[in-house]
Amino acid sequence: MRQVTVTEHLLLHQTKSPAATGQFTALLYDLILAAKIISKSVNKAGLLDVLGGTGQVNVQGEHVQKLDEYANRVLIHRMERTGVLCAMASEENADLIRVPERFEAGDYILIFDPLDGSSNIDVNINVGTIFSILKRKPGASGSKDVTLGDVLQSGVEQVAAGYFLYGPSTMLVYSSGQGVHGFTLDPSVGEFLLSHPDIRYPEQGRIYSVNESYWHYWDEPTREVVSYFKGPDNPLGKPYSLRYVGSLVADFHRNLFYGGIFMYPMDYRLPEKPQGKLRLMCEASPLAFLAEQAGGRATDGTKRILDIVPGELHQRVPLFIGSAGDVDAVEAIYRRHS
């Protein structure tokens, strides 16, 4: 069987996708190179001094893992040199990351979570890099004077989104608006090869993923949502299977293939985070883009995730994402309580 690389796949789809320009291809190429470097360190994490925390706390109020910090450095170092970016934003950085004056600037904006699920790395559970690609608004092309207003765009304006999953094999799953495609890294040739073309969600899932230990911090509609999947009064006529790793990208990836729903609702556990834990721009929005391209849906309970215009760089949102029928059921329950 003829193997198709990511670059070949992009070139084949350039006529269909306005995103697949030469600049976009160059951007994705450098992003893939950064992911290969990160993957190599993740695979050797138990042999290198990269396990555990740094002792620092990031802008999210979370303890920084050594691999978090390393992945963040790799991505910034590689991507600021591409010549096609005007700015970046990372889960680990409080402010916009601007392209230094010594490098050329382009019109693309890269937003990323450098190592999602990194708290699990010490016990060898899958982690990943989530990314979102935007284009700056017209009228400022070629300028490095990027404002927050250029970056705070709704998810529907994304040019592309995806993630790298570091596990038994390293995968790239991405979409530029022409479906969702999966590529697996062949370490013998150092290339991501097309392994899962045109990924589609099953219309109705069999899995629900949520941290049920927060039950006592949820409101009544949220408890009803979870009870719906735990009980027999659903299209399956029996309880869904609970599968929850605690690594967003790993849980999303499994449910994308098997069907089901991932939920991280708002809770009252932490008063400073009333909207839940997940970040709109570097987690919820890129995964929502993938979900919709794969025939699924993503909502905060009442609103489509891709329609939410962020008011700040690190805005948090509740997230219900997965098979369309399952997300429809969630919204129906919240509507009854509104």
From Swiss-Prot:
GO terms for biological process: fructose 1,6-bisphosphate metabolic process; fructose 6-phosphate metabolic process; fructose metabolic process; gluconeogenesis; sucrose biosynthetic process. Binds 2 magnesium ions per subunit. This is Fructose-1,6-bisphosphatase class 1. Coiled coil: none annotated. GO terms for cellular component: cytosol. Pfam families: FBPase (PF00316), FBPase_C (PF18913). HAMAP family: FBPase_class1. The gene is fbp. Its EC number is 3.1.3.11. Mg(2+) 1 binds at E91, D113, L115. Its cofactor is Mg(2+). NCBIfam families: PRK09293.1-1, PRK09293.1-3. It is found in: Cytoplasm. Mg(2+) 2 binds at D113, D116, E283. Belongs to the FBPase class 1 family. Its main location: cytoplasm. GO terms for molecular function: fructose 1,6-bisphosphate 1-phosphatase activity; magnesium ion binding. Substrate binds at D116, G117, S118, S119, N211, Y244, K277.
